[in-house]
Design a protein with these regions (language model features):
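Extended, charged catalytic domains and RNA/DNA-binding interfaces, predominantly
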Residues: 1-220, 225, 243-246, 253, ...
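Soluble non-cytosolic domains of exported or imported proteins
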Residues: 24, 232, 236, 269-273
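A short, acidic, flexible beta-alpha connecting loop/helix-capping segment that sits on the rim
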Residues: 46-48, 262, 296-302
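Short, solvent-exposed loop/turn segments at secondary-structure boundaries
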Residues: 53-55, 198-201, 230-233, 266-269
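Hydrophobic, well-ordered secondary-structure segments
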Residues: 147-148, 152, 208-217, 222-239, ...
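Short acidic/histidine-rich active-site segments
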Residues: 222, 248-272
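Active-site/ligand-binding-proximal alpha/beta "capping" segment
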Residues: 233-251
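Mid-to-C-terminal alpha-helical segments outside catalytic/metal-binding sites
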Residues: 270-308
Length: 308
């Protein structure tokens, strides 16, 4: 299994008494990942620009925690910086830890900070969160606004460095523009289908097809508000979005982006250790073993191989 997004590091930083990366009270830890037969887990460093006076300092603090936790449990987990590292964890049986930034604005439009983030081990950046940030407009802003000139410059630099470009939280016009700027695939790490659940955080059909045609992937988000009208996150709704993405974009576009530990905790899949329930549900819905393997890890693996 490869999961493209979780917010566990934010929770560990803000709630130090809740445990650590090996065992904690949240939905993701090493023990739970091992039960899920995890291959790669992306750990997002999420910075809410509206709640801190020093977003870059907050990023550094969370990054340091993440790197130190991975180091402390090096017999179980390894920071992956290249596809060679990915292949290494496949062979060793360790969990691969991918580190991302959720909120590109934390870098302040500074290309030197972008390069430093790469040196820090960041390999994926979610361009925006829920505020305009000097790079682009969020999903909850003006849909017609394109990326800023600085945003275009950043995206081009990310491609050159080998940092995965993530359009989750970005508005429609900015996402469409990525298709013109990039020569490599881009992703929506934790987004669903707007036609199934009308929410601006979800992707319309034309953008599902665009991401698919670029060779990109879309990680299914488990947040109940992006899935449907149920007050809890239900397996049947996740399956509905997954089947829809396959119908509109093909079986190579769909992946996992749980958003665990960043979404409301009332989820039918209680934590990462129960992910086999989702695998079984997709099989029961008619997907073949090969299609389930693509959804659970092979599509994401292909993307990592192309960009890292």
């Amino acid at each position: 299994m490869i999961d493209l997004h979780c917010d566990t590091m934010m929770q560990l930083l803000d709630h130090p008494d809740s445990g650590d990366l090996y065992r904690n009270t949240w939905k993701i830890d090493i023990e739970k990942l091992q039960k899920a037969h995890s291959k790669i887990q992306d750990f997002a460093l999420f910075i809410n620009m509206g709640e801190t006076n020093d977003p870059y300092g907050r990023y550094e603090e969370m990054r340091n925690l993440c790197v130190s936790q991975i180091h402390n449990y090096g017999e179980h987990i390894q920071h992956v910086l290249s596809y060679q590292d990915v292949e290494s964890v496949y062979k060793s049986g360790k969990i691969g830890a991918l580190i991302s930034i959720e909120e590109g604005g934390v870098l302040g439009g500074d290309l030197n900070k972008l390069k430093q983030a790469y040196q820090d081990g960041v390999r994926l950046i979610t361009l925006t969160w829920n505020y305009p940030n000097g790079l682009g407009e969020p999903h909850c802003g003006e849909q017609h606004k394109k990326l800023t000139s600085k945003g275009v410059e950043f995206v081009e630099a990310m491609q050159e460095l080998g940092i995965i470009v993530d359009c989750s939280h970005l508005n429609d016009a900015g996402t469409e523009q990525l298709g013109d700027i990039l020569d490599v695939p881009f992703i929506a790490s934790h987004s669903n289908a707007r036609e199934v659940r009308a929410h601006t955080r979800n992707l319309p059909d034309n953008l599902i097809r665009l991401i698919a045609n670029k060779g990109g992937i879309i990680g299914l988000n488990f947040a109940q508000n992006f899935l449907g009208t149920s007050p809890i996150s239900r397996i049947e709704d996740i399956v509905k979005h997954g089947l829809y993405l396959i119908d509109k974009g093909g079986e190579d576009v769909v992946a996992l982006g749980t958003d665990f530990d960043g979404i409301p905790p009332d989820t039918e899949i209680a934590d990462m250790s129960q992910m086999s329930r989702l695998y079984d549900a997709f099989k029961e819905a008619g997907l073949s073993v090969e299609q389930c393997e693509k959804l659970f890890w092979k599509n994401a693996d292909r993307l990592l191989k192309e960009i890292l």
